[in-house]
From Swiss-Prot:
Disulfide bond found in the keyword field: yes
Localisation: Cell membrane
Extracellular face residues: 1-28, 84-99, 169-193, 289-296
Record-given protein name: Thyrotropin-releasing hormone receptor
Cited function: Receptor for thyrotropin-releasing hormone (TRH). Upon ligand binding, this G-protein-coupled receptor triggers activation of the phosphatidylinositol (IP3)-calcium-protein kinase C (PKC) pathway.
Alphabetized CDD domains for the sequence: 7tmA_TRH-R (cd14995)
Organism the protein comes from: Ovis aries (Sheep)
BP terms from Gene Ontology: phospholipase C-activating G protein-coupled receptor signaling pathway
Gene (UniProt): TRHR
Regions crossing the membrane: 29-51, 62-83, 100-121, 145-168, 194-215, 267-288, 297-319
Length: 398
């Protein structure tokens, strides 16, 4: 990604090498180290909590794992080489490194865009077509879609292997090696425009339309009431009182489920909005430079574009922690599990509500949890221990 705005063909004129300001180098190294370091740790934690926590293995979280892996690839392949470039002022990874690192950069970028598109479509089906979701929004299908996404982007990004080469610029005081193009801008500019349309414009238009439909269902449509709730005439009969209690419990559970889905949708919508905003400077620069005879390459603005990209790849775990109680609890458990002292397990009794699905592999699109309160205690209960085990069942709101 360091060659987006491009090194041109090899230069042979002996001119003094442009000196990069020291403050620019210091700011670049510090920002990239902090953002990429935190982002790498955060995305690794996302992958670990979903893989190690059974109740977190949902179709939506499966797509978030794919997004986390793609973001990791961007942070490592695009962010860290930026540090060496700032220190040495030259490409130090050789020809093979030029091909492989650039390939991984665009693979991560495009896979993250496709992962966002995938979970947007999954959310739309789950909320707007709940009957179809039982068969379409499953964990096994999500894994197949993710495999297809990575296979498609892996093949698509192979074109960079045929476009790149090492460019050597000779100056009076130094020889600078850069990872650039073996073709002129007239040939690679259409590739950038196609990339811009396929992996930015189309996903953002699709996300805008689908989240509009989702918002209409979740936030604008009236929530249907439970007809069983109107049972005041049964108060004097003990059997009818139990039915009334179960009716209220069911209605509260329904409201909790709707609230949970709203919270999940808000979180994913924030991810999409930040993706659109933080990628806009770089994508705009690419489009503008495609039509300029001399590309705009001001150092500080290029740094701003890169920092926005790194922020986009690093900020998602923070969003999950702030907006999802499940992820917050899972992150806390991952950090504290090994340090937690041995204590007597606390016993809880809660009533469980399940949706019946035909196959055990067909999970609901999110775990519809309930808050543990006295309201949900009933005659049929399940006891479990609050221990630091991977198989622990956690009840919280998304």
């Amino acid at each position: 990604m360091e060659n987006e705005t491009g090194s041109e063909l090899n230069q042979t004129q002996l001119q003094p090498r442009a000196v990069v300001a020291l403050e620019y180098q210091v700011v670049t190294i510090l920002l990239v180290l902090i953002i990429c370091g935190l982002g790498i740790v955060g995305n690794i934690m996302v992958v670990l909590v979903v893989m190690r926590t059974k109740h977190m293995r949902t179709p939506t979280n499966c797509y978030l794992v794919s997004l986390a892996v793609a973001d990791l690839m961007v942070l490592v392949a695009a962010g860290l080489p930026n540090i060496t470039d700032s220190i040495y002022g030259s490409w130090v990874y050789g020809y093979v490194g030029c091909l492989c690192i650039t390939y991984l950069q665009y693979l991560g970028i495009n896979a993250s865009s496709c992962s966002i598109t995938a979970f947007t479509i999954e959310r739309y089906i789950a909320i707007c077509h709940p009957i179809k979701a039982q068969f379409l929004c499953t964990f096994s299908r999500a894994k197949k879609i993710i495999i297809f996404v990575w296979a498609f982007t892996s093949i698509y990004c192979m074109l960079w292997f045929f476009l790149l080469d090492l460019n050597i610029s000779t100056y009076k005081d130094a020889i600078v090696v850069s990872c650039g193009y073996k073709i002129s801008r007239n040939y690679y500019s259409p590739i950038y425009l196609m990339d811009f349309g396929v992996f930015y414009v189309v996903p953002m238009i699709l996300a805008t339309v689908l989240y509009g439909f989702i918002a209409r269902i979740l936030f604008l449509s009236p929530i249907p009431s439970d007809p069983k709730e109107n049972s005041n005439t049964w108060k004097n009969d003990s059997t009818h009182q139990n039915k009334n209690l179960n009716s209220k419990t069911s209605n509260r559970y329904f409201n909790s489920t709707v609230s949970s889905r709203k919270q999940v949708t808000k979180m994913l919508a924030v991810v999409v909005i930040l993706f659109a905003l933080l990628w806009m400077p770089y994508r705009t620069l690419v489009v503008v430079n495609s039509f300029l005879s001399s590309p705009f390459q001001e150092n500080w603005f290029l740094l701003f574009c890169r920092i926005c990209i790194y922020l986009n790849s690093a900020i998602n775990p923070v969003i999950y922690n702030l907006m999802s109680q499940k992820f917050r609890a899972a992150f806390r458990k991952l950090c504290n599990c090994k340090q937690k002292p041995v204590e007597k397990p606390a016993n809880y009794s809660v009533a469980l509500n399940y949706s019946v699905i035909k196959e055990s592999d067909h999970f609901s699109t999110e775990l519809d949890d309930i808050t543990v309160t006295d309201t949900y205690l009933s005659a049929t209960k399940v006891s479990f221990d609050d221990t630091c085990l991977a198989s622990e069942v956690t009840f919280s709101q998304s």
